[in-house]
UniProtKB/Swiss-Prot annotation:
Identification of the protein by name: UDP-N-acetylmuramoyl-L-alanyl-D-glutamate--L-lysine ligase
Origin superkingdom: Bacteria
Modification type N6-carboxylysine: residues: 229
Organism whose genome encodes this protein: Streptococcus pneumoniae serotype 2 (strain D39 / NCTC 7466)
Encoding gene, per UniProt annotation: murE
BP term (GO), one: regulation of cell shape
GO MF entry, a single one: UDP-N-acetylmuramoyl-L-alanyl-D-glutamate-L-lysine ligase activity
Length: 481
């Protein structure tokens, strides 16, 4: 529960409060109202709910519907002129985050918080950190792939970073479940729409940056995308940064007065003797490590997670055991066909991650390579050109273009857009299962490989705005082994 006096104090302190409007009368103070719940979903309200009217798609009808269920108060950036009082604020999403924090008892103060950001690798690094901290502590984890608040039950997340009310609710559940740490992914969108507003992390990790999530409903430019990624650094007590990433110099300047560790070729924390399933580290993590996830970028993610966990109480032994134990569904999963050919299933869904995936596979597999790939509809449109230009440089790869969450677009039109940048023949098969079957049929022996990119462990296709059931790339590939 939360008193209205507390709500108003929080909003005023942060410069978010404008006024209360009740039946046309303006108020600066108010008392004798207590809220037993908070919500941004108009279908989940009672007479004791404080409701947040948020989002570009919010309609007055939602509010009127909530009032028929007994709703008596709401927060908004404007007066919707309905028959209940409104708390007017300058920024509804900032207000929601601060009120949620207080409503759930400030759970962020009772947990050690670790956050990862980057264009790619967030989920893998989060899994490494979870497995490392599980050796000697009781972590909770919020990830794109899986969320656990008790260390035993896992469920799929709807967003990379949950809405603030859901986030602080989950943190509170983690506290109730006697968790000691919380590891989470923080997207640029989370800062763009203030899902983590007011939250300070104990350690923030910046893995890498490449142009992505640039489009009409995401970030208008790379500058905007990079700026919102960097906000994690100024909202973390200590930071870990990949010194080999693009634009590292500006990050180095930004964090010079903070506790920090840099890893990569320019600093002490480096990777040596990199092999498929092992590597050595220098610097703070000096030693030899076993790893199940193939690829140098996964070793970089492991080092980033290790450095972060070292600051949060993990021992070097914990770090070695945790890295060795880590597997991630849909992230560099490897299957073997009856003819010995390898099938690599990975979430790689932008030009840079696909480039790294191809390089890793071609390092270990020197025969025929087939690639199954699509690009999402109605978002990340810049990826299509990136994919096409990349694949134009790889005439040795037999490309099968197919559907990958086409949404309201025609998957074959997306395939045509990708192939317009490719000067050699490609196959186009709308049905993803058929595309996988066709790609796997071209292999003959153990040096051949099939790369199935984009969906990872997702068991759905987004079509016409809805998640339609799909067996998942791993299950489909297993049918044709």
């Amino acid at each position: 529960m939360i008193k209205i006096e507390t709500v108003l104090d929080i909003l005023k302190k942060d410069g978010l409060f404008r006024e209360i409007i009740d039946q046309g009368h303006y108020h600066y103070n108010y008392s004798k109202v207590i809220f037993d719940s908070i919500s941004y979903d108009s279908r989940k309200v009672t007479e004791d709910t404080l409701f947040f009217a948020k989002g570009a798609a919010f309609k007055k009808e939602y509010l009127l519907s909530a009032i028929t269920q007994g709703l008596a108060w709401y927060v908004a950036e404007k007066d919707y002129e309905v028959d209940i009082p409104v708390i007017i604020v300058n920024d509804i999403k900032k207000a929601m985050s601060l009120i949620a924090m207080e409503f759930y008892g400030n759970p962020q103060e009772k947990l050690k918080l670790l956050a990862f950001t980057g264009t790619k690798g967030k989920t893998t690094a989060t899994y490494f950190a979870y497995n490392i901290l599980s050796q000697g502590h009781r972590p909770a984890m919020l990830s794109t792939m899986n969320t656990t608040l008790d260390g035993e039950t896992f469920f799929k997340s709807a967003l990379t970073t949950p809405e603030s009310i859901d986030l602080f609710d989950m943190m509170n559940q983690a506290v109730q479940n006697d968790r000691t740490h919380l590891i989470m992914e923080v997207s640029s969108q989370a800062y763009l729409v203030h899902r983590v507003y007011g939250l300070t992390f104990d350690v923030g990790v910046f893995l890498n940056i490449t142009p992505d999530h640039i489009g009409p409903i995401e970030h208008p430019s790379f500058e905007d995308y990079f700026y919102h990624k960097r906000l994690l650094m100024e909202n973390s007590r200590a930071v870990i940064i990949n010194s080999d990433m693009d634009h590292f110099s500006v990050l180095k300047e930004q964090v010079e007065d903070q506790d920090h560790d840099f890893y990569g070729s320019q600093f002490d924390n480096q990777i040596e003797n990199s092999k498929a399933f092992s590597f050595s580290a220098t610097g703070k993590l000096a030693g030899d490590y076993d790893i199940q996830l193939i690829g140098n970028f996964n070793q970089e993610n492991a080092v980033a997670a290790g450095l972060a966990c070292l600051r949060l109480g993990a021992s070097l032994e914990d770090i070695k055991k945790g890295i060795a134990a880590t597997r991630v569904p849909g992230r560099m999963e490897v299957l073997t066909q009856k003819n010995g050919a390898k099938v690599f299933i990975d979430y790689a869904h932008n030009g840079d991650s696909l480039k790294k995936l191809i390089n890793v596979v071609e390092t270990h597999q020197t025969g025929k390579i087939a690639l199954v790939l699509g690009s999402t509809g109605n978002k990340g449109e810049s990826r299509r050109k990136d994919f096409g230009l990349l694949l134009n440089q790889h005439p040795e790869i037999q490309v099968f273009l197919t559907a990958d969450d086409p949404n309201y677009e025609d998957p074959m039109a997306i395939a045509d857009e990708i192939s317009s940048y490719i000067n050699h023949p490609v196959e186009k098969i709308a049905d993803r299962q058929e595309a996988i079957k066709a790609a796997m049929a071209i292999t003959n022996h153990e040096l051949d490989a099939v790369i199935i990119a984009g969906k990872g462990a997702d068991c759905y296709q987004i079509i016409q705005g809805k998640k339609e059931s799909y067996p998942g790339d791993t299950a489909v590939a297993e049918n044709y082994l």
